Swiss-Prot record:
Belongs to the methyltransferase superfamily. RNA methyltransferase RsmG family. S-adenosyl-L-methionine binds at residues 83, 88, 134-135, 152. Specifically methylates the N7 position of guanine in position 518 of 16S rRNA. Keywords: Cytoplasm, Methyltransferase, rRNA processing, S-adenosyl-L-methionine, Transferase. This is Ribosomal RNA small subunit methyltransferase G. Coiled coil: none annotated. The gene is rsmG.
Length: 223
């Protein structure tokens, strides 16, 4: 079993319970989740992709709460992870949902190189890495239209919709991880979302198995 750090102040549980939660979320690919945790805690931290204070919180704040967003996605669809960074949420999602075809979009060279290394080391055949920004024409042409565009902590909601919805087919949607400010962002950025082609909005939680479920906002592309 891959090594990992049991964090304090979030789970308040034993090693066995963390293993149980990880096994539930990642299923038969749980060993790949441990391997990814190890890469983030070592290379990811050394190369500046994960802050030292975040390393003890990798399971709760990064791997598990990202993986559970798959609960909001249909089977066998194409997903784009915008501003993937160290691979969040795209890599945990790809591990938990091998039926998904996931493209990680990341503008910085050093991060995109790391993502490529993770893909190879974990043998994630359902993952592709594109270096660039979601709003760039070349990226959009290379990607094509996807069913879902997802992201975490990338930008305010209105700007995020402007990046995400153009990548999505008509009838598809963007699914963003957001915190408690999501309602205020939605009210503030309503016009920007509409301009980007957004329609029906849904705010909901996934990951009931977690102590702190993940809050998502889903916006369907209608035009």
């Amino acid at each position: 079993m891959w090594g990992y750090t049991v964090e304090k102040g979030w789970f308040h549980v034993k090693h066995e319970e963390i293993e149980s939660i990880a096994s539930h979320v990642f299923g038969g690919n749980v060993d790949k989740a441990y391997a990814y945790h190890e890469l983030l805690a070592t290379d990811g931290s050394t190369r500046g992709f994960i802050g030292p204070r975040e390393v003890p919180k990798l399971w709760s704040r990064h791997l598990l709460n990202c993986a559970v967003i798959g609960e909001a996605m249909d089977e066998n669809i194409r997903v784009a992870d915008i501003g993937s960074g160290a691979g969040l949420p795209g890599i945990p999602l790809a591990i938990a949902r091998p039926d998904l075809t996931i493209t990680l979009i990341e503008p910085l060279l050093k991060r995109s190189v790391f993502l490529g290394e993770v893909k190879e080391k974990l043998e994630l055949d359902n993952v592709t890495v594109i270096r660039g920004r979601a709003e760039e024409k070349a990226v959009r042409e290379q990607l094509g239209l996807v069913d879902v565009a997802t992201s975490r902590a990338v930008a305010p909601l209105g700007k995020l919709a402007g990046w995400s919805l153009p990548l999505v087919r008509l009838g598809g949607k963007m699914i963003a991880m957001k915190g408690s400010s999501v309602h205020e962002e939605l009210e503030r950025d309503e016009k920007m979302i509409w301009k980007a082609g957004g329609g029906k909005v849904k705010i909901f939680s996934v990951g009931e198995v977690l102590e702190e479920p993940t809050t998502l906002i889903s916006i369907r592309k209608v035009r």
